[in-house]
């Protein structure tokens, strides 16, 4: 059972802090809540407690974005930074990315938004064991790189074929498996079944060329929680992983994708 988190609410407005604190208490009565009205109080709180989720107003007085980034990287690398704002300024996704934010949400904050973030924290605060099964070395390397760009923390093991995948699954834990449908030595769906039998809570993403929706739905029979069509980029795999764990995909990631469509990175399925 995941322990209740420590939530830091940093906002100059007392009513906003109170409303957010009450919402958190409704959703997770065990959560510990710390408040800060300015940057000085924020830094003291970050130094004095292990904060799991930081809700911070983008206009908090005496605040330095570099301090938030430093805490995100060294104080609690698994901590979530959520920027809160009355309106979205131009280039807000780039600003959010610079401070290592997980998401940006607009005031007033409703229980639905807060609940989604608390649910995300329960998964993102843990190190997850991931098994990547694909005959292509370049593909496995790219999947590892893309997963490393996400807010998830993965311990990744790789297998080029189904038999190695089954052996690895029997030898250690699996929280997420990403399995290419066309394996050279063993039916991929049989691999999915074996992993599902051994690790019933594991999320299993099948991947490969696009298939019909009806076939995608049939994959659930074999324990698959989703299908990731190739070629894919960071947005696609990040969204699929969020959905496989039942999590809402951050608005920020969607916005960053829109900004970067003209500067697309490498995709699986291209010559690497």
Language model regions located:
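Hydrophobic/aromatic residues positioned on beta-strands within the core alpha/beta folds
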Residues: 84-85, 207
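Receiver (REC) domain switch/output surface
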Residues: 103, 114-124, 237-250
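CheY-like receiver
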Residues: 116, 124-148, 157, 248-272
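C-terminal output helix
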Residues: 91, 109-117, 214, 232-242
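Alpha4 helix (beta4-alpha4-beta5 surface) of REC/receiver domains from two-component response regulators
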Residues: 66-67, 87-103, 190, 210-226
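Two-component/phosphorelay signaling modules centered on CheY-like receiver
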Residues: 14-34, 137-157
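Short amphipathic alpha-helix used as the core "switch/output" element in two-component signaling
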Residues: 66-78, 118-120, 167, 189-201
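Acidic, metal-coordinating helix/loop segments flanking the phosphotransfer/catalytic sites
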Residues: 21, 35-53, 61, 158-176, ...
């Amino acid at each position: 059972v995941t322990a209740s988190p420590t939530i830091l609410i940093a906002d100059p407005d007392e009513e906003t802090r109170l409303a957010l604190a009450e919402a958190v208490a409704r959703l997770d009565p065990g959560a510990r809540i710390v408040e800060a009205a300015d940057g000085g109080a924020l830094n003291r709180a970050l130094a004095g407690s292990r904060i799991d989720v930081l809700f911070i107003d983008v206009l908090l007085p005496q605040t330095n974005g570099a301090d938030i980034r430093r805490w995100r990287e060294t104080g609690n690398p698994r901590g979530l930074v959520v920027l809160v704002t009355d309106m979205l300024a131009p280039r807000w996704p780039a600003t959010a990315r610079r401070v290592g934010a997980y998401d940006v949400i607009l005031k007033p904050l409703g229980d639905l938004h807060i609940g989604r973030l608390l649910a995300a924290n329960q998964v993102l605060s843990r190190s997850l064991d991931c098994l990547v099964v694909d005959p292509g070395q370049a593909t496995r390397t790219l999947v590892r790189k893309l997963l490393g760009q996400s807010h998830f923390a993965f311990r990744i093991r790789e297998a080029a074929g189904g038999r190695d995948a089954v052996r690895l699954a029997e030898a250690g834990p699996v929280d997420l498996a990403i399995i290419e449908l066309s394996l050279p030595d063993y039916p991929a769906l049989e691999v999915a079944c074996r992993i599902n039998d051994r690790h019933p809570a594991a999320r299993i993403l099948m991947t490969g060329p696009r298939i019909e929706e009806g076939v995608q739905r049939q994959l659930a029979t074999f324990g698959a929680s989703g299908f990731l069509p190739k070629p894919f980029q960071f947005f696609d795999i990040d969204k699929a992983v969020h959905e496989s764990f039942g999590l809402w995909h951050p608005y920020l990631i969607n916005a960053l994708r829109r900004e970067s469509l003209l500067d697309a990175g490498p995709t699986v399925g291209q010559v690497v």
